[in-house]
Amino acid sequence: MHLLAGLDRPTNGRVKIGGEDITEMPDKQLTKLRRRHIGFVFQQFNLLPMLTAEENILLPLSIAGRKPDKAAVAALIARVGLGDRLGHKPSQLSGGQQQRVAIARALASQPTVLFADEPTGNLDSTSGTEVLQLLREAVELDRQTTVMVTHDPRAAAAADRVLFLADGEIVNDLASPSEEQILVAMKEATHR
């Protein structure tokens, strides 16, 4: 994921985001590209504790010097179900609510690609299901490209395509697999 997001540089091959080759892009230009084209959702939420939910959601736009589209942000907040929690700080929110803030923050800038690193890893099954539904809605309603890294077969089954990695290599590629197909492929990948 770090290679795809331009956080690390590949030793060979090319990486393109939004049609732009980022493989040898200078750091300043790469930072600007990430601000414009990439959203991140992490397992640990990475919300700033001194900011409210609303301030956390709008932070990437502020950093990028972009004015928020108030209607789009309001629709996003309604979609993630946080309208009544915008004035709350992260410590006043449940884990599921914090992850919904993180998803709204990542989507607020309308990125070309959303990277989700174990987005359900710290959540109970109900909150995890809600997060997967939000990511799925972003794909279906906004045509949002999403790359999710997970060890959870249930989470992976929400994807249109699942790649299996073992020892740094892609060892399997399944289109819209079931949870059972993923479990079989995971077992095969670990016993190669």
What are these regions (language model features)?
Residues 1-159, 165:
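ABC family nucleotide-binding domain
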Residues 169-192:
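Conserved beta-strand-loop-alpha-helix hinge in the C-terminal portion
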